[in-house]
């Protein structure tokens, strides 16, 4: 395995403020009515109810980080979070404006700045990273190491996070499909077919309703399950490509089982 890896997954909600700013809905609507209105409008015009990437806001970022020191699985917390209050159930997001999205995204890119890990995703190049990039632009964030394609470090010219065919960002869905959208498969289905748990509980399509209900804890658990499944599929990929032996694969599987 590489020196350090970061499996990640994001859960998003509609960018209500962005929708209002662009004049896509009548003024004076509540957050809930904004989303209901634009969803209805899109469906009536033959579009998907799923909003485009640039109209998504990042609510949860789940991460599995592994290096020589071991494993860590968690969701990135905003700078103003108070774990004691959160555990006591005293912190609840009451509106989109309470979401410290900027802090979460900044921390995600800071992990890359500090460790330069190989990042692992399932459809991360198609969804997660474009959303993170758009939101980082909106907030005026800086992520030079993520964007470096050899300008600062010559080695990054040949293996960087941006090039679709490089392995610095390994999008498992993309590479296993041989970069063909006609062959894409869901993480849940492939994980279950491979003998892993797959998704447990909530579906990504239900995140907005979970947000309105203040169920951040449940969505975090759902997101962390996704990153674990992504990591397990990554281990299968390492075995498939001969990057690890069968014995090494079994050791890595035992490690994650014992950790969980």
Can you say where each PLM-predicted feature lies in the sequence?
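Metal-dependent phosphoesterase core characteristic of DEDDh/y 3'-5' exonuclease domains
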Residues: 2-4, 56-59, 64-98, 105, ...
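Conserved "right-hand" nucleotidyltransferase catalytic core of DNA-directed polymerases
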Residues: 252-260
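Entry/capping segment at the start of metal-dependent catalytic domains
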Residues: 1-58
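Alpha-helix capping and helix-coil boundary motifs
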Residues: 27-43, 83-84, 100, 215, ...
């Amino acid at each position: 395995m590489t020196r350090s890896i970061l499996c990640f997954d994001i859960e998003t909600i509609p960018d209500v403020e962005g929708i209002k700013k662009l004049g896509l809905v009548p003024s004076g609507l509540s957050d809930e009515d904004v989303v209901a209105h634009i969803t209805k409008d899109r469906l009536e015009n033959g579009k998907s109810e799923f909003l485009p990437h640039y109209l998504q806001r990042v609510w949860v970022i789940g991460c599995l980080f592994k290096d020589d020191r071991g494993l860590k699985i968690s969701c990135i917390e905003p700078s103003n979070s108070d774990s004691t209050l959160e555990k006591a159930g005293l912190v609840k997001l009451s509106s989109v404006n309470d979401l410290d999205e900027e802090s979460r995204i900044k921390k995600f890119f800071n992990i890359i700045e500090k460790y330069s890990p190989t990042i692992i995703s399932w459809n991360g190049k198609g969804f997660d990273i474009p959303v993170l990039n758009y939101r980082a632009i909106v907030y005026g964030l800086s992520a030079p190491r993520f964007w470096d394609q050899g300008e600062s470090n010559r080695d990054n010219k040949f293996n960087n996070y941006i090039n679709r065919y490089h392995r610095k960002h390994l999008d498992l869905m993309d590479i296993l499909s041989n970069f063909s959208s006609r062959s894409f498969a869901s993480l849940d289905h492939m994980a279950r077919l491979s003998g892993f748990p797959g998704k447990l509980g909530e579906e990504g399509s239900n995140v907005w309703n979970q947000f309105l209900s203040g169920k951040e804890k449940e969505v975090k658990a759902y997101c962390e399950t996704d990153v674990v499944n992504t990591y397990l599929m990554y281990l299968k990929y390492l075995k498939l490509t001969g990057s690890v032996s069968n014995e090494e694969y079994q050791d890595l599987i035992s490690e994650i089982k014992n950790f969980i």
